[in-house]
């Protein structure tokens, strides 16, 4: 289902939920399986004509909303979340941490399935030379991603910091490939796909030890883990890696 949400911060997800739900209600198509990603998509999933419905989540949705929105919005999300999850025949997540959170807080069971990495796509990437002292951030320009922490210390680092917040996948991978370090300064996460992509391209990683990130990175073996919300430690670790 192709839906274009309103591209405005804090309106994007609600607009997607509304538009996709309307499309599902009026659609006459039927399916064997409908697979929805994250809570905003579940409303469309509910009204789809399908034999089985699968909902995958990447992080505990109510906690994500709580970090970004008002208490009222967070309370609504928490109440809605527990109801929405019951609409699916099967629930999946790509993080053991998220699976545990939902079990402990809502008593809901999820199947754990790692998100795959399509390595065939990497064959189309061109060979690019490394750029000296280049650091790259790839992700949304959003508070929970911690991009502000990197911007806070950018002028204190003798390096070129590249922010890829709205690039197509291939363009972002070229930037990653030519960089010396990938920085993932998130305040909350599930399992960032960008870490797997950096592994494949053999790019060193500095990431916060939040969410499912420690499920991928072993400190000082497969990457560097730092505490969240700590721009000082982020700067120290970047300087050490450079």
Which stretches of residues belong to each language-model region?
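Carbohydrate-associated surface elements
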Residues: 97, 116
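Conserved acidic donor-binding segment of nucleotide-sugar-dependent glycosyltransferases
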Residues: 219-220, 224-231, 239-242
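Short His-centered aromatic/hydrophobic patch
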Residues: 36-41
């Amino acid at each position: 289902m192709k839906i274009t949400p309103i591209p405005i911060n804090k309106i994007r997800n609600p607009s997607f939920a509304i538009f996709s739900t309307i499309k599902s209600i009026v659609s006459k198509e039927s399916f064997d399986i409908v697979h929805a990603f994250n809570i905003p998509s579940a409303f469309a999933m509910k009204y789809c004509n399908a034999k089985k419905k699968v909902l995958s989540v990447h992080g505990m949705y109510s906690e994500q909303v709580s970090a970004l929105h008002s208490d009222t919005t967070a309370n609504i999300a928490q109440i809605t979340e527990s109801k929405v999850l019951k609409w699916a025949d099967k629930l999946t997540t790509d993080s053991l941490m998220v699976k545990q959170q939902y079990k402990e807080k809502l008593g809901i069971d999820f199947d754990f399935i790692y998100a795959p990495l399509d390595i065939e796509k990497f064959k189309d990437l061109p060979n690019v030379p490394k750029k000296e002292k280049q650091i790259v951030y790839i992700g949304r320009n959003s508070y929970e991603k911690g991009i502000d922490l990197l911007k806070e210390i950018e002028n204190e680092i003798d390096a070129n910091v590249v922010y890829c917040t709205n690039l197509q996948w291939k363009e972002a991978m070229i930037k990653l490939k030519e960089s010396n370090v990938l920085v993932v300064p998130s305040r909350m996460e599930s399992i960032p796909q960008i870490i797997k992509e950096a592994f494949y391209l053999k790019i060193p990683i500095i990431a916060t030890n939040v969410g499912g990130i420690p499920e991928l990175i072993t400190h000082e073996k497969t990457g560097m883990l730092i505490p969240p919300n700590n721009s000082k430690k982020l700067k120290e670790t970047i300087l050490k890696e450079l």
